[in-house]
């Protein structure tokens, strides 16, 4: 389960209000808050996914509903649900910043709190581009994801049961282990087989995970905190947004500010 950060403590109350308003359904509104440190309670490997598009929400992660859309100001992103919060509707800082401003957090970082955004549970295929594995399968830790995977394999028609891949990497920030694929002969065996020893805590440096710090927008290596240049993942959607026809951008912005003005004066 994701640890509570000072940011989550200060902003979590508003998100819990959304959770009490029926956000466990298939669509609705949530108070989205920014989160700047990748984690996964089910062992999804950050070096194999786009960590700038992750949802950290109160509901437990299940074997089917792992993808949600989040929309604000005419913009929409798809987010992987691979971790569980303790009440807040946190999303990756870059996703929050892009939805709120139209810019990546590495380009124009913005500080702020809970923002009302529209969400919907969507088919997992909508998050395929966020999975950096062959066949867009969910990358799981062979050593530390078996409880979750076993629960999904017990549901053979579930999305995860049909779309997973195991790696001999121990932690979600890919600091320990071997970057190699493992297999499991389920249900005959309950332990994966890997080319190297399963769970070997070798120092892994070839597959770093990056975080974007709140509110500075600096990109850092998750395992060490070392500041590095911004990665391409954080720029793609904001570039697409800015590439829209100027009149369309203007129309969307005008509508957004009109709605904000109405809310302020009502």
Regions inferred by a protein language model and the residue ranges of each:
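Mature exported/compartmentalized surface modules and terminal targeting/interaction regions
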Residues: 2-3, 12-60, 64-66, 77, ...
């Amino acid at each position: 389960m994701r640890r509570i950060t000072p940011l989550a403590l200060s902003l979590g109350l508003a998100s819990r209000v959304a959770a009490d308003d029926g956000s466990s359904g298939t669509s609705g509104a949530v108070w989205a808050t920014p989160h700047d440190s990748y984690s996964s309670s089910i062992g999804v490997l950050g070096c194999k996914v786009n960590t700038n598009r992750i949802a950290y929400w109160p509901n437990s992660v299940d074997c089917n509903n792992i993808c949600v859309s989040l929309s604000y100001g005419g913009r929409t992103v798809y987010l992987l649900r691979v971790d569980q919060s303790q009440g807040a509707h946190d999303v990756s800082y870059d996703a929050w910043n892009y939805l709120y401003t139209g810019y990546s957090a590495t380009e124009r970082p913005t500080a702020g709190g809970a923002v009302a955004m529209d969400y919907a549970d969507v088919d997992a295929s909508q998050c395929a581009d966020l999975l950096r594995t062959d066949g867009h399968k969910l990358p799981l830790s062979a050593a530390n994801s078996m409880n979750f995977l076993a629960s999904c394999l017990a549901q053979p028609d579930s999305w995860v049961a049909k779309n997973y891949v195991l790696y001999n990497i121990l932690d979600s920030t890919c600091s320990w282990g071997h970057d190699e694929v493992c297999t499991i002969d389920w249900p005959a065996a309950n332990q994966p087989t890997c080319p190297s020893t399963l769970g070997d805590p070798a120092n892994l440096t070839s597959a770093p995970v990056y975080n974007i710090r709140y509110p500075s927008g600096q990109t850092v290596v998750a395992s060490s905190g070392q500041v590095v240049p911004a990665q391409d993942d954080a720029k793609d959607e904001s570039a697409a947004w800015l590439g829209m026809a100027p009149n369309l951008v203007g129309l969307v912005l005008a509508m957004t500010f009109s709605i904000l003005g109405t809310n302020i004066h009502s």
